Design a protein with these regions (language model features):
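C-terminal non-catalytic regions of proteins with extracellular/luminal or membrane-system context
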Residues: 3-5, 11-15, 19-199
């Protein structure tokens, strides 16, 4: 009654708005740490281990607007890296369970051992931030932080993508990360925007 549905079909998810979404995503990312020139990724990089269930979750990239978005249209970090680096092998592993945060270290280590660099996605799910989602403890999940620590034992460069809708505490993993990007939830073009930033 109050919307022009035909106009909505033409505008929502149009190429122009997706380009704007990608651009605003790039401008929203905050570089918190970058040691030993971990970023941008070296042109010589040929194998990336992408670890962390958030890196392959379309719904979580929309944050607390997830119920209003079109999940199938979201570009995950996994998709974004493969598009941005077509000549690079991207080996993905969950690393942890999205629901329970139980660690899946064996598959994460296997992917990490085959890589030149490790990119780890940690943080909050779509339903953990937003209106009426206050928390007494804003520390990144202990198992997710432990995952970062364990992956650093490979001796490889570790880049952390910190996702969520609020500032978070991550003292336990910080010493084990060579670079940390606060990527928030960047919406439909999340994966493309993040891939642009790290390249």
């Amino acid at each position: 009654r109050y919307c022009d549905e035909e106009r909505e079909k033409k505008i929502v998810l149009s190429a122009r708005l997706r380009d704007l979404s990608r651009e605003s995503g790039r401008k929203s990312v905050v570089l918190l740490k970058n040691e030993k020139q971990a970023l941008p990724l070296s042109p010589s990089c040929r194998r990336i281990a992408l670890i962390g269930a958030l890196a392959n979750s379309q719904k979580d990239m929309m944050g607390f607007w997830a119920n209003e978005g079109v999940e199938k249209e979201v570009v995950t970090v996994y998709e974004g890296l493969k598009r941005r680096f077509p000549n690079v092998t991207v080996n993905y592993a969950d690393g942890y369970d999205l629901e329970t945060n139980d660690l899946r270290l064996s598959e994460a280590r296997a992917a990490a051992n085959r890589a030149d660099v490790i990119v780890v996605a940690v943080g909050e799910r779509f339903n953990q931030s937003g209106e009426a989602k206050s928390r007494a403890d804003i520390t990144v999940n202990a198992n997710q932080q432990l995952l970062v620590k364990e992956l650093k034992k490979t001796g490889k460069t570790v880049i952390v993508l910190l996702m969520g809708g609020r500032p978070m505490i991550f003292n336990d993993m910080e010493p084990h990360a060579d670079a940390i990007l606060l990527t928030w939830w960047l919406g439909t073009e999340s994966g493309n925007a993040i891939a642009d930033i790290i390249s």
